[in-house]
Structures are given as C-alpha cells and as structure tokens.
C-alpha cells in the first residue's frame, strides 16, 4: 500500500507480551525514512479532555476520506512506525490542514525558526 505524508492510516501495534495487539489510527508525519518506516503521530478518539499539545481533527480537514469517530492528534508522542503494520488508509488531510498540524508540532517542540 502506498502511503505518504498527510495520510491517516490504521496500524496494528503489539503490546510488550507480543501476543496481544491493538489497532490505532496514526497520522503519517514524514514518510521518506529508510527501511520502510515513517514518523507517525498517534490519534485518539478520547476527546473529552483536550490538552495544549493535542489538536482536534475535523472532517473538514480531509481532502479525501475521514475517520470513523471525532478524534485528536497527540502531538507530544511522535514515533517511528514500520509500514508493514499498516492495515488500511482512512484518508488524506488537505495540504492546508497538514501544514497547520506541522506548525502546531513545531510550536510545541520549539523547532520553528
């Protein structure tokens, strides 16, 4: 499956026992890493408490597709994901929305110029 930055995908993550797993949506933040990896930002549907380092994902943020539930990005938790654990693609954020989330990420980690 072809994935690129701004895609939102469903991934299977194993717990430390390597026997049980959970499927989680992830924003593909940077996709041109070696070894078929990408930098992902986790997504949660637990939107009751929205922290300063989290951002709501609205249906209007998508250029195609959407998530099944209202959700938020957890910007403080970027991590490396193997493309081998991607189950399916939910959709793609519009370029304007993806740019906004990149800016929020950089603001949080103070990596802006």
Regions picked out by a protein language model, each given a short descriptive name:
Residues 19-23, 28-63:
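Compact nucleic-acid interaction/catalytic patches
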Residues 62-113:
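C-terminal terminal-subdomain/extension
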């Amino acid at each position: 499956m072809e994935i690129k930055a701004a895609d939102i995908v469903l991934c299977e993550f194993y717990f430390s026992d390597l026997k049980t797993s959970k499927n989680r949506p992830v924003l593909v933040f940077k996709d041109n890493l070696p070894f078929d990896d990408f930098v992902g930002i986790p997504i949660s549907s637990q939107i009751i408490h929205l922290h300063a380092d989290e951002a709501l994902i609205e249906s209007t943020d998508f250029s195609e597709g959407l998530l099944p539930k209202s959700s938020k990005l957890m910007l403080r938790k970027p991590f490396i994901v193997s493309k081998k654990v991607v189950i399916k693609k939910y959709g793609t954020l519009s370029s304007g929305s993806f740019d906004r989330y990149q800016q929020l990420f950089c603001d949080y980690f103070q990596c802006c110029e």
